Structure formats: structure tokens, C-alpha cells
């Protein structure tokens, strides 16, 4: 467990506050998890962002009438901190009985508070339900590898030694799997996700990639670090000209987290999947 997470509200009984309380946000430094992967803020081999979607966003108009919407938050992958998810939920709940002059005022407040917690500017977008309905759900790009016939016996920790590639072939392709699962490092609750790998490099053996993804099944870590670990393991193996790894996790507590890591500039369409 990340030492800072021990002091967060995650896994503890919490009082739900319904009036605006920005102090509820609990930042967790990324540095310790980066260090586990041999990284530092100065040596990150990727660009990226963590997209959060909130489906339980509500506040009051000056008249006292409630509003509901969907919040979309984009936190830079190189920000000093992540925001602990339960504290994020509690903070958003604190808006429920708080009046804002208009949506722009709420967005400005969210931007200020979340940027302060993350340590870098956070992008905020508030979508109406009609806008979300119009966007619908998306299918992941590329080939789904989930129907490949594999044998698995170890689920306790990620196993990069399972990954194989053909050094004699260079390809450019997109593949994805819906079989990503890990566990929350604090509560041990399951985190269900789908993951996409897009790259140009030595041809990746798809069955070995699926075996590797399944090896995360009992692994305990935050969403962001799981994606960073996958990125680094594939980068070492494939020596790619370009590489993108991103995951879309099933929501918990009204929030879903979607980490995106890439050697390229961020080109990400934040549209939910069927399980989100």
C-alpha cells in the first residue's frame, strides 16, 4: 500500500458532507509509485493523462433548484499527485447542497480545487445528460484478443516474462482486451477494466499479451500504476517507434478512471464503453 493512502478516507467510514468542502480532497504523491518502476518526475518515458468521469454530479441553482450532469476531469500524467478516489467522491458530494450562479462558476471552482490537489492544471468539462446520450458508447479500436486459447496458473503479480515478440517483424497495430482486473491496494475491492495497446515495433505475440494481462488479476495497485507498468514492460520488449497504452475502468462510487500513457501527444476520445 502507498504510505500516504493509509491516511486517506479510502476503506474507512466517512461522514457525507453536502455543502462545499474542498479540504476533503486527498492528494497522494506519485513519486513513490514511480520509484517502484524505476522512474522519477524527470525521467518519465511517456506523455499522458488520467481521465475521470463523474456520474453523480449535482448542485443547486441560485433558486434552489437542483441540477444533475456528468463531470469530466483530465489530470496530467506528470502531475505530482493523484487524487484518492474516495476523497474525490466525498468532495463532489459536498457540492450537492451548494448553489452556483451558473455552470461556468462550478467549472471554475472545480478547476481551481482539483488543480491545487493534483499540483498541475486540471481540465474540467461538465456535460449535460443529452450530450452524453448523443455520444453513446464506443467500441475499442483494433483486434480483441480475449478469445485466444491460453492457459493461466499465476494471478498474484504481473509477469512480464510471459510477453513474447517476433524480432524479425515490425508491425503497426492496435489490440485490446476486456479481461484486465486488479485490486484496490487499500480495500482489496476488484477493479475491472479494458485495455488498449497501440504500437509500431516488433510484432507482439497476442496470446502472450493476454496471458500477461490476466496475470494482473490478483495484483494490488492503483489504476494509474497498472497502466504505467504495462507501458514500461511493453516498451522494454518491443523497443517501439511509438507506443500507447490506455485503460478504461468500470466505475465505482460514481467515478471511473481512465489512464492514458503514450510516447505521442495525447489523442484520446473520452467516450464510455458498454461496461461503463
Swiss-Prot record:
Coiled coil: none annotated. One of its GO terms (cellular component) is cytoplasm. One of its GO terms (molecular function) is preQ1 synthase activity. The keyword Cytoplasm applies. It catalyses: 7-aminomethyl-7-carbaguanine + 2 NADP(+) = 7-cyano-7-deazaguanine + 2 NADPH + 3 H(+). It is found in: Cytoplasm. Its main location: cytoplasm. InterPro entries: GTP-CH-I_C/QueF, NADPH_dep_7-cyano-7-deazaG_red, QueF, QueF_N, QueF_type2. Homodimer. This is NADPH-dependent 7-cyano-7-deazaguanine reductase. It comes from Pseudomonas fluorescens (strain SBW25).
